[in-house]
Amino acid sequence: MKTSIAPRNVSADTDCGLFVFGVLAGMLALASCSSRPDAFVAPSDVRDGLRVSDNHHYVVDARTGAPVFVLADTAWNLGALKLDEIDTYLRSRAEHGFNTVMFVLNFAPQAQENNAYGQPAYLGPDKTELNPAYFETCDAIVRKAADRGLYVMLYAMWAGEKAGTMNGYTAAQLKALGRALGHHYAGVPNVIFCAGGEASPHYIEVDRVNAIGAGLKEGCEGRNLVTVHPVAENSDSRFYAASPWLDFYMSQAKSGSAPKNAAYDAAALVLGDWSIAAVKPTMMAEHRYESGTREDPLMQRRSLYQCVFAGGFGYAYGHDALWQMTPHTGLPWMLKGWTPGVENWTQALDTPAVRQLHYIKALLYSHPYLTRIPDQSVVLEGQGGDVFTRVQATRDGTPVRNDATYLMAYISAPRNVVLNTGVIAAPILRVYWFSPETGASEVIDGELPNPGRLSLGERAQGGDWIVVIEDASRKFPLPHFLPAEGR
């Protein structure tokens, strides 16, 4: 049996009808809102730290076990800013719902080796000793981030082909440096370690990366998560699946802001990590950066939802002006492929995409989280052939079993789609649209007999949408009604 549902508008006083983030959300959910009433903001307490979930697919609060979706912002060259500027940056990221920032301790030669105060991160004949003055500044950044409910992902250094210093170290030196850095921040709950940026073949040998990774894990005594950032078009799983120090995988797709990079299938890297034998959480750490202030946010939304619905526990957004901290990055070759589009990094803090990406947290936290799996088999008709038209599906439950309580499908572009609702073990369903652009939830039917096959008509409004189909008896909250501790 196949039931067809055409999109329709419903009034606000209809049971479970139309709800749009706005002033009402700010009044009803003060605990999860900032002065921007439509912002879903991380709480200020990150003192519990993070650990890998028991099923090895997600990360959770280390004390409570509550799921944590990592929405990161890319700030490789954060050290180029002074502390008052950094506070401006961190405040903006928290207000826009990010809960993680990523930056590099030694970003030379892409940037100056010293930070804004003239301090290099590492000293000594081998540059394996931590500079007390530099780390006094870095400690202040970590504290400021914690005060705003932000995790910090600290990259020890970069190993890129033309833009890294990591290749100048021996394995023994890297292990010593990793051990020192790990020890310095051991148990600091909002610190996540990254062994290096673009630290995989063919830029650097696996043995050297394993050395610094093992040093970090040894130095922190296993109290912090440790990962590494691979070269483009790769996941860590290709090189480090057997490395005991690695807690979660990162992928890098195509980072340059050229339009052709938007066509790269980033979600395939994430999905590839889901079912390998060495199961670890996986996230998209670098994809096509934004440039300027007028780009269509659809490109960023598409990448986010496709990667997360493919099994990602997190996602990193990036803007060319913010990772460079324009105008502080000075290598001409970088500016050709990664054009900031603005004269100063502060102009890139509030793009349309930045205002929209955090809505995914409300959607994910309103449903059973740790049992969520990717499942393209529920898309029976309407699957697109590329990232611009794909329908990316996720649900909870067990693969190949009809034990779900919900399913979600991200529809990248207007199209007719047929979904297998038989995976939901319930006679009555609630079906609604969720807008990744506005955060609005629009209920289509709150008491739909489960047809097994559900046909969704093409939305006249166009753009991208998520359809959410649930066991009606579960009475899951619509995405804005969330507990304050959900982050």
Language model segments and positions:
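Aromatic- and carboxylate-lined catalytic core of secreted/periplasmic carbohydrate-active enzymes
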Residues: 66, 290-291, 300-445, 457-487
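C-terminal motif of bacterial Sec signal peptides marking the signal peptidase cleavage site
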Residues: 31-32
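Aromatic (phenylalanine/tyrosine) cluster motif
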Residues: 19-21
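Short, low-complexity, disordered segments immediately C-terminal to signal peptides
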Residues: 37-42
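Active-site mouth of glycoside hydrolases
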Residues: 45-258
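Short strand-edge motifs at loop-to-beta-strand transitions and within beta-strands
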Residues: 452-454
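Extracellular glycoside hydrolase catalytic/binding regions
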Residues: 192, 197-343
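N-terminal secretory signal peptides that target proteins for export/translocation
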Residues: 1-16
